Amino acid sequence: KVHRGDLVVEGNIESNQKLIVLGNLTVKGNISTFSLSNPWVILGNVTATNIVADSPLLITGSINASGLVFIDSYYDNPSTIKGSINARGIFINDIIAPVVASSTNSEFMVRASDKHDTENVKKALMIINPDAYYWGLINDEDALKEIFKRSNIRMAGNVCNQMKKEALFRPKPSPE
Protein backbone atom coordinates (compact mmCIF):
# COMPACT_ATOMS: atom_id res chain seq x y z
CA LYS A 1 0.00 0.00 0.00
CA VAL A 2 1.12 3.55 -0.73
CA HIS A 3 -0.46 6.47 1.10
CA ARG A 4 0.28 10.01 -0.09
CA GLY A 5 0.35 12.56 2.72
CA ASP A 6 -0.02 12.12 6.46
CA LEU A 7 -1.90 9.02 7.63
CA VAL A 8 -3.83 8.90 10.92
CA VAL A 9 -5.24 5.55 12.10
CA GLU A 10 -7.75 5.23 14.96
CA GLY A 11 -6.99 2.06 16.92
CA ASN A 12 -4.33 -0.64 16.58
CA ILE A 13 -2.53 -1.86 13.44
CA GLU A 14 -1.45 -5.49 13.05
CA SER A 15 0.04 -6.12 9.62
CA ASN A 16 2.20 -8.43 7.55
CA GLN A 17 1.86 -6.20 4.46
CA LYS A 18 4.15 -3.60 2.90
CA LEU A 19 3.38 0.00 3.74
CA ILE A 20 4.69 3.23 2.23
CA VAL A 21 3.56 6.53 3.70
CA LEU A 22 4.67 9.72 1.96
CA GLY A 23 4.27 11.74 5.15
CA ASN A 24 3.80 11.12 8.87
CA LEU A 25 2.12 8.02 10.32
CA THR A 26 0.10 8.51 13.51
CA VAL A 27 -1.56 5.48 15.08
CA LYS A 28 -3.87 6.11 18.03
CA GLY A 29 -3.06 2.70 19.47
CA ASN A 30 -0.37 0.05 18.97
CA ILE A 31 1.60 -0.99 15.87
CA SER A 32 2.58 -4.62 15.35
CA THR A 33 4.28 -5.75 12.11
CA PHE A 34 5.33 -9.33 11.43
CA SER A 35 6.88 -9.87 8.00
CA LEU A 36 10.54 -10.37 7.22
CA SER A 37 10.13 -9.43 3.57
CA ASN A 38 7.54 -6.63 3.59
CA PRO A 39 9.15 -3.36 4.70
CA TRP A 40 7.51 -0.26 6.07
CA VAL A 41 8.79 2.97 4.52
CA ILE A 42 7.64 6.14 6.26
CA LEU A 43 8.83 9.47 4.83
CA GLY A 44 8.18 11.33 8.06
CA ASN A 45 7.61 10.58 11.74
CA VAL A 46 5.87 7.57 13.31
CA THR A 47 3.78 8.07 16.45
CA ALA A 48 1.97 5.31 18.40
CA THR A 49 1.42 4.00 21.91
CA ASN A 50 3.62 0.88 21.54
CA ILE A 51 5.50 -0.41 18.49
CA VAL A 52 6.65 -3.98 17.84
CA ALA A 53 8.27 -4.28 14.41
CA ASP A 54 9.44 -7.57 12.92
CA SER A 55 9.35 -5.95 9.47
CA PRO A 56 12.27 -3.92 8.11
CA LEU A 57 11.73 -0.20 8.77
CA LEU A 58 12.95 2.85 6.87
CA ILE A 59 11.78 5.96 8.67
CA THR A 60 13.13 9.34 7.57
CA GLY A 61 11.85 11.06 10.72
CA SER A 62 11.60 9.98 14.34
CA ILE A 63 9.72 7.28 16.24
CA ASN A 64 7.60 8.60 19.11
CA ALA A 65 5.93 6.09 21.43
CA SER A 66 4.49 6.73 24.87
CA GLY A 67 5.27 3.11 25.78
CA LEU A 68 7.59 0.51 24.25
CA VAL A 69 9.48 0.24 20.96
CA PHE A 70 10.63 -3.30 20.06
CA ILE A 71 12.52 -3.62 16.75
CA ASP A 72 13.61 -7.05 15.52
CA SER A 73 16.06 -6.88 12.61
CA TYR A 74 16.73 -10.09 10.68
CA TYR A 75 19.52 -11.20 8.36
CA ASP A 76 19.72 -8.84 5.36
CA ASN A 77 16.71 -6.72 6.40
CA PRO A 78 18.16 -3.94 8.55
CA SER A 79 16.07 -1.08 9.89
CA THR A 80 17.03 2.59 9.71
CA ILE A 81 15.50 5.45 11.66
CA LYS A 82 16.97 8.75 10.45
CA GLY A 83 15.65 10.69 13.43
CA SER A 84 15.51 9.68 17.07
CA ILE A 85 13.60 7.00 18.95
CA ASN A 86 11.60 8.53 21.79
CA ALA A 87 9.86 5.95 23.98
CA ARG A 88 9.53 4.90 27.58
CA GLY A 89 11.60 1.80 26.79
CA ILE A 90 13.42 0.44 23.74
CA PHE A 91 14.34 -3.16 22.89
CA ILE A 92 16.41 -3.70 19.75
CA ASN A 93 17.35 -7.13 18.45
CA ASP A 94 20.03 -6.55 15.81
CA ILE A 95 22.29 -9.57 16.25
CA ILE A 96 22.77 -10.03 12.49
CA ALA A 97 21.34 -6.97 10.72
CA PRO A 98 21.93 -3.55 12.29
CA VAL A 99 19.24 -1.19 13.49
CA VAL A 100 20.52 2.34 12.94
CA ALA A 101 19.00 5.22 14.90
CA SER A 102 20.36 8.74 15.19
CA SER A 103 19.66 8.95 18.92
CA THR A 104 17.45 7.54 21.64
CA ASN A 105 15.55 9.07 24.52
CA SER A 106 14.10 6.55 26.97
CA GLU A 107 14.23 5.23 30.51
CA PHE A 108 16.18 2.26 29.18
CA MET A 109 17.45 0.86 25.91
CA VAL A 110 18.45 -2.78 25.55
CA ARG A 111 20.26 -4.12 22.49
CA ALA A 112 20.06 -7.89 22.22
CA SER A 113 23.45 -7.86 20.52
CA ASP A 114 25.04 -6.59 23.76
CA LYS A 115 24.82 -9.57 26.10
CA HIS A 116 26.76 -7.74 28.83
CA ASP A 117 24.40 -4.79 29.24
CA THR A 118 22.91 -6.01 32.52
CA GLU A 119 22.37 -2.44 33.77
CA ASN A 120 19.72 -1.64 31.16
CA VAL A 121 18.21 -5.11 31.42
CA LYS A 122 17.78 -4.49 35.15
CA LYS A 123 16.05 -1.17 34.40
CA ALA A 124 13.72 -3.00 32.02
CA LEU A 125 12.96 -5.65 34.63
CA MET A 126 11.99 -2.97 37.14
CA ILE A 127 9.39 -1.18 35.00
CA ILE A 128 8.14 -3.69 32.40
CA ASN A 129 5.50 -6.28 33.22
CA PRO A 130 7.47 -9.59 33.23
CA ASP A 131 5.11 -11.30 30.78
CA ALA A 132 5.84 -8.61 28.21
CA TYR A 133 9.44 -9.56 27.63
CA TYR A 134 10.03 -12.89 29.32
CA TRP A 135 7.87 -15.90 30.14
CA GLY A 136 9.30 -16.41 33.62
CA LEU A 137 10.69 -14.32 36.42
CA ILE A 138 14.39 -13.54 36.39
CA ASN A 139 15.82 -13.54 39.89
CA ASP A 140 19.60 -13.59 39.56
CA GLU A 141 22.51 -12.06 37.71
CA ASP A 142 23.30 -15.21 35.68
CA ALA A 143 19.77 -15.32 34.34
CA LEU A 144 20.08 -11.69 33.23
CA LYS A 145 23.03 -12.63 31.05
CA GLU A 146 21.00 -15.43 29.46
CA ILE A 147 17.88 -13.40 28.66
CA PHE A 148 18.72 -12.76 25.01
CA LYS A 149 19.79 -16.31 24.25
CA ARG A 150 16.07 -17.11 24.31
CA SER A 151 13.84 -16.90 21.25
CA ASN A 152 13.36 -13.24 20.35
CA ILE A 153 10.32 -14.17 18.30
CA ARG A 154 8.73 -15.61 21.43
CA MET A 155 9.75 -12.49 23.30
CA ALA A 156 8.13 -10.28 20.64
CA GLY A 157 5.03 -12.47 20.73
CA ASN A 158 4.74 -11.94 24.48
CA VAL A 159 5.11 -8.20 23.98
CA CYS A 160 2.27 -8.28 21.41
CA ASN A 161 0.06 -10.22 23.82
CA GLN A 162 0.71 -7.66 26.55
CA MET A 163 0.00 -4.82 24.10
CA LYS A 164 -3.49 -6.26 23.62
CA LYS A 165 -3.95 -6.27 27.40
CA GLU A 166 -2.52 -2.73 27.68
CA ALA A 167 -0.26 -3.97 30.50
CA LEU A 168 3.27 -3.54 29.20
CA PHE A 169 4.43 -1.61 32.24
CA ARG A 170 4.12 -2.45 35.92
CA PRO A 171 1.74 -0.19 37.89
CA LYS A 172 4.82 0.99 39.80
CA PRO A 173 8.51 0.10 39.43
CA SER A 174 9.59 -3.00 41.31
CA PRO A 175 12.18 -2.59 44.06
CA GLU A 176 15.79 -3.30 43.11
Q: Where do the PLM segments sit?
A:
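Extracellular beta-strand solenoids
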Residues: 2-3, 9, 15, 21, ...
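Long terminal segments
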Residues: 76-176
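Acidic (E/D-rich), amphipathic helical modules within compact regulatory domains
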Residues: 37-38
